[in-house]
Amino acid sequence: MTPSLSLGQRLDDRYLIQLHLGQNSLGQQYLAQDTHRFDEPCTITVLTAPPGDKAGNLFKQQAEILYALDHPQIANFREFFALGSELYLVQDFIEGQSYFDLLKDRRLQGKAFTELEVRQWCRQLLPVLHYLHIQKICHGQISPSSIMRRTVDGLPVLVDFTHSQYYSGTPGEDRRDLHGLGLGAIALLTGEVNPNPPWENLLSSVALSQEFRQLLLKLLAWPPLVDWPTLTDNLNNLPQHFLPTVAEFNLTSTIPEQTDNGVGKSSTGEPPFPTVHQSPESSSSAKVKNMVRVDGLKGLVKKSFILLGLMAIAMALGWGAGQLWLDNQQRAALEKLAQEEPGDDVPEKTDLEIKNEIRARRLNLGISPQRFQTLMDDGLAFQLGIDPQQRLEKNPNTNGAPLSLGSPEQQMAMTITVLDALESLSREATRDFAQNNSGDRRRWIPRVNQLRLSSRSFYDLVNARFHHYLPMVSPALLGEPEFEQRPLAQVWNAMAFDSLASLEDESHYQRLSFDDTNQLNLNGTLEPGEGYAYAVTIPPTEEFSLQLTAPPTARISFYPPTGPEVILQNSAMHRWSGPTDQAGYYELVITSVAEEPIAFELELSIIPASAQPF
């Protein structure tokens, strides 16, 4: 079928078509950018169907079901609309590969999925299937082709709801997806995309523990001989060390030959299975992923006698050396255990996994790659002390490309730093930032003044937050006109957006007065980079004192109502006393440069003239 949308087309004045993904069971599918949601990627399925057409009704039914669902392992609904005779379904874009494609790649190598992988696949699918069944929805097509492995976290995600429907009350209908889960598992284990019974024969061709084999046979029965709670318990209680000791010998199966359909075969005509190569550190109790097949009992017995003979010779000649080696190994193991901390055995993420996580975080913010790179480069320029004009110079050794900034490690660290800063913004500030609406910082000052605060108090609050997330920019530079032209100034503006909101909703602002008292006592907790502002009316010609009880990482500013005079500004000195001879609102700002929350108490006192010492 000819694609109905062209690349670069803007559909419904909103969706910018990026790529034709192909055709699924109902229609053509495209990758697009949602220009109303920070250019987030999404998929659009298009179906051309006349009114009342059966396919069109199925398409609408799928959209209605998706509309009612909200789960992180479902390609969630965004919009459904019609234009002329075409129906459009918009869903979240899931970056990854279908399990059908993953299985196809394995088959080209003469391999399939291991038992441990399929166990995990089943366990990870159970929460989303259970969620569907709570909604009285049967997915109806649990198969490798309708499930994707999401790149960012490796979780299986349901993407095709073509055959989904609400329960109609037919006996066994609530267990249809259990049967589908069993069919999907056997497909991944055997490489048979459309497996057929007898199931025992299929399962005999792969290395499985007896417990998992029996569980699969219960799923594959119709109706399934296991319910949802029992399946969950059985999967969680399967033994972890299930393989026979023959796997320890590291026997190698026959190298598979490639067949026309891409599935490898051994010389015996049976499907091959990947072998296990254990490292010298592996022990007999180590977790083994796959079991090799041995052709017949005779071969096993023969090889066992040979092995036993070799072991006897080794025992006779090397017992002393063996004991010494064991002692050394035990000592080394004990030393290693003594040094290791909990979690040391967690595998490090690959570069690809890290990059995918970073991309997912950036996409969630709705910021283009080019703009994000500009922010990162600006951060590195501040960190490395590089002048912006120098950044624009051309490097003759890179064919005219701009100078690259920092080492790969510095670039990665700055990427994380900028992401953390942007993710600290509220949704409204993020939208304002993504749409380049932050503008001139001075546009907010009239609203700040309505709170009886000046721009310097407001800037103290914003600067504290900005410096917490982006410390490579010196606080002294934040007020300079040159900084307002830098890319990172846009982040400052977005943080100012949030800071103003926190003042106006009075979550970080309070107006105070000494009506019938000479003393005010305040207290609170400051999160890292956070601040509070107070507008205080203090009678003139009186002695006034303030005392802040807080860790040294707290900072305080104290400004008079008028003029450029500064009493305290971002000061680590937490105590002050003196005359307050101006009428109006004095401004108090408390901020934190700590890396953890800190508590504070603030005491404000008026000392009457009669109580002052002569």
Swiss-Prot record:
SUPFAM superfamilies named among the record's database cross-references: Protein kinase-like (PK-like) (SSF56112)
Annotated Polar residues bias: 256-269
InterPro entries recorded: Kinase-like_dom_sf, Prot_kinase_dom
Residue span of region Disordered: 256-284
MF-aspect GO terms: ATP binding; protein serine/threonine kinase activity
Family: Belongs to the protein kinase superfamily. Ser/Thr protein kinase family.
Protein name (record): Serine/threonine-protein kinase-like protein E
